Design a protein with these regions (language model features):
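OB-fold and OB-like beta-barrel modules that bind single-stranded nucleic acids
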Residues: 1-3, 72, 128, 166-167
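Short C-terminal domain-edge/linker segments immediately following a structured domain
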Residues: 30-36, 71-75, 103-106, 156-162
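Conserved non-cysteine loop/helix-boundary elements of the Radical SAM core domain that shape
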Residues: 1-71, 77-96
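Terminal RNA-binding accessory module
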Residues: 87-167
Length: 167
């Protein structure tokens, strides 16, 4: 499930003209986890939106820790001509935005590794997608229902098939 977050701070969300709060967002994630078995939840975050402060950025990091996304798509804010955000004052220096961006990536990478480790030993259905020529042993790339990449040994005749594999 991909639920667009944009920011983990209500003040930033308001400046973005988003019509939801972080509490409403968290509730949506809770409902997914209540009604689906091990749902993969992904999101996107914009770093350095005009007016974002260090404290607001820290709120986004805190929300990442709280929700524990499976993966994250993140971008440094860049103005688009014709949008309201392009006309906003943007006091955040690019160097600061880059630091925030890296902290966000580092935090999510750690969370993703922790979440991946939870799957070790489990048997999951996968779709065998393509050959993996870079690995002579685990020569097939597969995807779980939660879009996790899994490398397994096998014959190319398995391409396009669904199989169960032990992680």
């Amino acid at each position: 499930f991909h639920l667009s977050l944009q920011s983990g701070c209500d003040a930033t969300l308001k400046r973005m003209n988003r019509k939801y709060t972080t509490k409403e967002y968290e509730r949506g994630c809770e409902l997914l986890r209540k009604y689906f078995v091990h749902p993969a939840i992904t999101t996107d975050v914009i770093v350095g939106f005009p007016g974002e402060t260090q404290e607001e950025f820290e709120e986004t990091l805190s929300l990442l820790e709280e929700v524990r996304f499976d993966s994250l798509f993140t971008f440094i804010f860049s103005p688009r001509v014709g949008t309201p955000a392009a006309k906003m004052d943007d006091p955040v220096p690019m160097e600061e935005k880059k630091k925030w961006f890296q902290r966000l990536l580092d935090t999510q990478n750690r969370i993703s590794v922790e979440k991946h480790k939870e799957y070790i030993g489990r048997i999951l259905p996968v779709l065998v997608e393509e050959e993996n020529p870079a690995d002579a042993v685990n020569n097939l790339n597969c995807r779980t229902d939660g879009w996790r990449l899994v490398h397994v040994p096998g014959d190319v005749s398995l391409l396009g098939q669904r199989k169960k594999v032990k992680i």
